[in-house]
UniProtKB/Swiss-Prot annotation:
Name the UniProt record assigns to this protein: Urease subunit beta
Gene that encodes the chain: ureB
Chief subcellular location: cytoplasm
GO molecular function, one term: urease activity
Subunit structure: Heterotrimer of UreA (gamma), UreB (beta) and UreC (alpha) subunits. Three heterotrimers associate to form the active enzyme.
Length: 101
């Protein structure tokens, strides 16, 4: 194997299989673009993003690791979220949870 080479098995890879999902509409009410990364706790995103925050507690974007979604100013966009896995303990981000969900 060479540095940077991938060894991907044949077949389909299903991300986040069997995990709870949620589809919501999000509006960027701000005057600047907002980008949200794949593992950011969606509940704690920029306050200029308008959506039912309480519904998103314990969820993140259902996109490939290392990628992000960009919300342009004034844009409404539908996104799919997936439940955070593991121990469901959240630290950091905007500091709104800092512990168990």
């Amino acid at each position: 194997m060479k540095p940077g080479e991938y060894d991907i098995q044949p077949g389909e890879i299903i991300l986040n299989e069997g995990r709870a999902r949620l589809t919501i509409t999000v509006e960027n009410s701000g005057d600047r673009p907002i980008q949200v990364g794949s593992h950011y706790h969606f509940y704690e995103t920029n306050p200029a993003l308008v959506f039912d925050r309480e519904k998103t507690r314990g969820y993140r974007l259902n996109i490939a690791a290392g990628t992000a979604v960009r919300f342009e100013p004034g844009q409404d966009r539908e996104v799919e979220l997936v439940e955070v896995s593991g121990n469901k303990i959240i630290y950091g981000f905007r500091g709104e949870i800092m512990g168990e969900l």
